Amino acid sequence: MSKIGPEVGDVRTSRRTFSGNGVTVESYTAMPVVPVVDGGAQMPLQSPALILIHEWWGVTPHIEDIARRYAGEGFIVIAPDLYDGVTTTDAGEAGRLMSELSLEKGLAYLQVVLAELRTWPNVAAIGVTGFCMGGTFALRLACAAKLDAAVPFYGDIPEDTGFIAGLSCPLLFIGGEKDAWITTDKMGRLAAALEQYSQPGEVKIYAGASHAFFNDTRPEVYSPADAADAWQTVIDFMKRKLLPEGA
């Protein structure tokens, strides 16, 4: 089921519902506009797709903006709502929502979206990215399902990193040196696990950057120069990993 939204530049947005295995997931989608119609929405042929996972605030206008930016770069983007329609600007409420979302439930939602994307004949390859809580889920999904690329932004890394042995794709982890939550020690733990399990991954740490430095709606932590560099780095990485050779 889909509800088609307006075109913004060369991007079409919609809100779509995906179901499977007893799970129903509402999602915000954005994709390049081309004259090919499939399932009620316009989609490009043989394009890379991204699952974009939100921060602990929910699917906010900031996440929708990121989805449109990716679509403007040629990606089909699905931003699944792990909070079933709830958003907040209150950190206490966000913390409660995040704590009530189990890893198992979040991954079940994401697996439904991934299964849906795999049925779209126009999808060439699938990557995942996410921020904060979404970065945690992006990392976990890349270790629990077959994907083609993963870029978690400042997601959590637990002490037990054994799950990294299941990493299915090239990984680019992005963090900030001054992040008080996802510390350099945690990121070092991830780098060590990637080496231990001989997994294809890189940890990129921005000097002086804080947690959520990419979020331009939060001036207290936003770092414009680092965000711009991270954006171009991620676009280049995703295109290298998700586009066919010579595309």
Task: Go through the PLM ranges and name each one.
Residues 66, 183-194, 202:
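Short alpha-helix in the alpha/beta-hydrolase fold that links the catalytic acid
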Residues 75, 82, 155, 206-208:
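Active-site loop/turn elements of alpha/beta-hydrolase fold enzymes
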Residues 111-168:
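Primarily recognizes the serine-hydrolase "nucleophile elbow" in alpha/beta-hydrolase
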Residues 197-247:
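C-terminal catalytic histidine-bearing segment of alpha/beta-hydrolase fold enzymes
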